[in-house]
Amino acid sequence: MSWPTYVDDHLMCDIEGQHLTAAAIIGHDGSVWAQSATFPQFKPEEVAAIIKDFDEPGSLAPTGLHLGGTKYMVIRGEPGAVIRGKKGAGGITVKKTGQALIFGIYDEPLTPGQCNIIVERLGDYLLEQGL
């Protein structure tokens, strides 16, 4: 299966008539493996800061998680594995695998829990595959 197929079929999938606003799979080096058409244009330093938070949990808390110029307040995640952020009625979930970061961005009516399930399910599968 190609990386764009993972984004289209597994991240941008329909959940009770709703879907993520945007999604992407990005390598630890900041290279885009695949992304939805709606995924924001991000800066390399934004991805570097996210990677740093996986290595040093809590490093994003004082400044927030920034992606494509949007600032998300960092909320409880799983240190070293999942970062979650909130902005208004929406937010972001980032799951780290061995080689990539899985991004899911949502807005109402999709819930944070639904976003977490979508992103973390694919991330767990890729981890099982050694990716």
From Swiss-Prot:
InterPro entries attached to this UniProt entry: PFN, PFN_euk, PFN_sf
Segments crossing the lipid bilayer: none
Q: Which CDD domains match?
A: PROF
Where is it mainly found?
cytoplasm
Keywords (alphabetical) are:
Actin-binding, Allergen, Cytoplasm, Cytoskeleton, Disulfide bond, Phosphoprotein
Question: Which molecular function GO terms apply here?
Answer: actin monomer binding
The family database entries (SUPFAM superfamilies) matched by this protein are listed as: Profilin (actin-binding protein) (SSF55770)
- Which Pfam families did the record assign? Profilin
Q: Where in the cell is it found?
A: Cytoplasm, Cytoskeleton
Q: Which GO terms describe its cellular component?
A: cell cortex; cytoskeleton
The SS bond pairs are 13-115
Disulfide bond among the record's keywords? yes
Motif stretch (Involved in PIP2 interaction): 81-97
Among SMART domains, the record links this protein to: PROF (SM00392)
The answer on whether this UniProt entry bears the keyword Magnesium reads: no
After translation, the protein is modified as follows: Phosphorylated by MAP kinases.
Indicate where the modification Phosphothreonine is found in the sequence.
Answer: 111
Family stated for the protein in its record: Belongs to the profilin family.
Additional free-text comment from the UniProt record:
The variability of the residues taking part of IgE-binding epitopes might be responsible of the difference in cross-reactivity among olive pollen cultivars, and between distantly related pollen species, leading to a variable range of allergy reactions among atopic patients.
Question: What is its quaternary makeup?
Answer: Occurs in many kinds of cells as a complex with monomeric actin in a 1:1 ratio.
Name the record gives this protein? Profilin-4
UniProt organism field: Olea europaea (Common olive)
Classification from the root reads:
Eukaryota, Viridiplantae, Streptophyta, Embryophyta, Tracheophyta
